[in-house]
């Protein structure tokens, strides 16, 4: 709470999951799927202890996904369906989760780098006009990730469910002109794994199966350090073969699919996306920065988001970055290469790094009403332009 007794709330709206809680805490109070479902056929009132309602949000929606028409309000990190997003926020602030009176609360929201102005403006409008929050602050996710690591300068590689961003931050400011975006993330890896399993004769094309394959992916997939070697192992041996028990009791075996699915992060052409992979984008991003900041950036690369949790990802990224630097900057000069230092930080809590940074920042700033929080009064008097100006954003 701030000095006036108002609760300070932090909400990290991800494409796949909402993480919400309070300033000063080191873990979200609630994590739930950012999905909305409506019954396909109203044939029954209850399933187990869950009542089937006309509108289901979050965990209940995920558990009953076989019976529902599922909609994800966010896509690639950006809100596409505001009506359904409002249902997700009703769930967040209502008795099911935080159970707050917005008029007595300050709210810190997170946004992806390169968030369109129209998206941010609509978010302010909804939070002030529909919910009536006392005051609001919007922070860029990459900056919050660095705060959670105790850093002000570094490059954040943030890959969640809907989008991957590489965002350099200098002295606490996100450098948007250098930010790289890749529209490949967790959801695309799940879709590609479904396709690979289909080629093996396993059919997972129902929307309900999507969650099953997502859980399978999180349990079994990894990033190959050496793709050719893994391909040989998959072809010639059964070393990579692991079994997975489906919810209905059937058992399936996964082999090469375990590394082939997440490989699209490094080789987007596998799913017909003509973009550079993760290592190329990261290298290009750092090399495009000021020559004085490059060494700092190479020494402070921070991974964030659930899709960076794959075993093997930090070492593969480091290997490819070093190779790119040796080939393109040093032109094969191995003596100079000995002095090149690179450090990739992969904190164990990186799935929730954005929330943690938000909780730290909101706690530090909870009483800085004049120069930090945008109040409802300021919004009503000066409109969206005043809000953007206070946040230091050109409207």
Swiss-Prot record:
InterPro entries membership: Actin, Actin/actin-like_CS, Actin_CS, ATPase_NBD
Compartments in which it is found: Cytoplasm, Cytoskeleton
Entry-linked CDD domains: ASKHA_NBD_Arp2
One MF annotation (Gene Ontology) recorded for this entry: actin binding
UniProt keywords, alphabetically: Actin-binding, ATP-binding, Cytoplasm, Cytoskeleton, Nucleotide-binding
Effect of deleting the gene: RNAi-mediated knockdown suppresses the memory retention defects of the msi-1 os1 loss of function mutant.
Binding sites annotated in the UniProt record for ATP: 160-162, 214-218, 305-310
Main location: cytoplasm
GO cellular component, one term: cell cortex
GO terms, biological process: Arp2/3 complex-mediated actin nucleation; epithelial cell migration; gastrulation; morphogenesis of embryonic epithelium
Record's subunit section: Component of the Arp2/3 complex, at least composed of arx-1, arx-2, arx-4 and arx-6.
UniProt record similarity statement: Belongs to the actin family. ARP2 subfamily.
Name of the protein: Actin-related protein 2
Gene from which this protein is expressed: arx-2
